[in-house]
Amino acid sequence: MRRQEAGTSSLATRVGPEVLTTAAVASVTGCDDPLAAVLLGRPKVIEVLQRSAELIDRVPALAAAHHQIADYHAMRSRFFDAYLADAAAEGIRQCVVLAAGLDTRAFRLPWPDGMTVFEIDQPTVLRYKENALTAHGARPAAAWHPVGVESDMPWPRRLWESGFNHNEPTIWLAEGLLPLPDATQDALISEIDGLSAAGSRIAFDDVLGMCSGRSDAPGWLTSRGWWTDVVEARHLPGLSGRRDDDAQSYTAHAALVTAEKIA
């Protein structure tokens, strides 16, 4: 999961990557998500975005890349939205979002009764999101548990302390988190596997064919009793009703992976 130095006073340092990802999606979707508008509307966040926009506008190639990345992020978000909603509709009642950042799915997805959503990230990021949404009067659509984890603390322990039940099936989301260095990635997936009861599901995005010899997350899951499906992201424009050559070029090596634990 993301690790940044605690104690820094700069908002750009503390939540910059999350803010910029949220802004990228909003720029493509027209910012029709009121919660995204809330998270992006604070003065210091606006300052971060304005500086970023000024830099992007100065470099045509950077502007084109920004559009490609934003388009992919928006399509990826819709894909995972549908996957999580379907899994919950089929009976799973707890979801864990890893490196949640400014994710608002606990608030905006149509969760069924009895649903619990755990969000794991740095305490600073989660506090920023909670304060912004609370001030706006937003209410979660599920039982919402922000799980703040410092860099020196095992995240599974914090998850258990927050009420997670490893004996029940779980929906895991690791959006934008992989790939990681081999040892780190293997350890993360191994921990998820150990915390997952039969019937659990996981969704994440990955990069295929870029680094020979890199740890194969889908293959690892398959070898341990997970039924795995890989969707090449270049096919997403067709799935979502969009046709964009720029998005196709950016997503040439990207894939969306979903898996269900059978054994």
From Swiss-Prot:
InterPro entries linked to this entry: Ppm1/Ppm2/Tcmp, SAM-dependent_MTases_sf, SAM_mthyl_Trfase_ML2640-like
The keyword Disulfide bond is assigned to this record: no
Pfam families per UniProt: LCM
GO terms (BP aspect): methylation
Entry keyword set: Methyltransferase, S-adenosyl-L-methionine, Transferase
Binding site for S-adenosyl-L-methionine: 121, 150-151
Function: Exhibits S-adenosyl-L-methionine-dependent methyltransferase activity.
Family the UniProt entry places it in: Belongs to the UPF0677 family.
Name of protein: Putative S-adenosyl-L-methionine-dependent methyltransferase Mjls_0079
Originating organism: Mycobacterium sp. (strain JLS)
